[in-house]
Design a protein with these regions (language model features):
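Conserved alpha/beta-hydrolase
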Residues: 48-76
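Alpha/beta-hydrolase active-site loop
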Residues: 82-102
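Glycine-rich nucleophile elbow surrounding the catalytic serine of serine-hydrolase chemistry
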Residues: 114-124
Length: 204
């Protein structure tokens, strides 16, 4: 049975606290996996997966990124990384968790897994902190042409200036995710594309 311990550590932004969890096996650990979750997720959402891995000897750690889960201390902070260098701070927080965990398990192989938004954070992490993990798993990633990204960024920036950068924008959300569900019509929910499991979709 997995042992789970939740804790907080200071964010690299110098203001926030980052919520995290560590799952440990009953027996001697064989490796460490750090998870970088996706947008609108949180680390504890991966608890069943983490518990499965502990049965095979893994230590698993996952934090809630800035603006997510228990790292978002106010409703206004939900999905908001911050006013300055937010992406950088999220990646630096991932590195801080890695350093904290590696200090506890210095001799174990260390792996980093990023899903969806977490995959892009992981790619940035590998550029900023090369050689600090033994391997990486990049799931649900992709890329877009600058010709598509630039207008989307301009629309998001304009929406932020008009309504506030912590406000929810249906237009920006539609631009980011709207096309995904078209492949799964007729749709039961707005996020049918997320998983083949209806339970996973409903819990999300």
């Amino acid at each position: 049975m997995a042992n789970c311990k939740e804790f907080y550590f200071p964010s690299s932004n110098g203001v926030s606290r980052i919520h995290a969890a560590e799952w440990t096996p009953d027996g001697p650990p064989v490796a460490v996996l750090q998870i970088a979750h996706g947008v609108a997720e949180y680390g504890m959402r991966y608890a069943p997966f983490a518990e499965f891995l502990t049965e095979h000897g893994f230590v698993v750690v996952a934090n809630d990124h800035l603006g997510h889960g228990l790292s978002a201390e106010k409703d206004a902070e939900t999905l908001y990384f911050g006013p300055h260098d937010g992406w950088k701070h999220v990646v630096d927080d991932m590195y801080a968790l890695r350093c904290r965990t590696k200090e506890k398990y210095p001799d174990l192989p260390y792996f980093l897994m990023g899903h969806s938004m977490g995959s892009f954070l992981t790619r940035t992490y590998l550029i900023r902190y090369p050689g600090t993990v033994d391997a990486a798993i990049i799931m649900g990633t992709g890329q877009q042409s600058p010709a598509i990204v630039a207008p989307g960024r301009a629309i998001a920036k304009a929406a932020g200036k008009r309504h506030g950068f912590t406000a929810h924008s249906p237009r920006v959300e539609s631009l980011a995710f709207g096309a995904y569900n078209k492949a799964f019509a007729p749709n039961r929910t707005e996020v049918d594309w997320l998983s083949v499991s209806q339970n996973n979709v409903d819990s999300y």
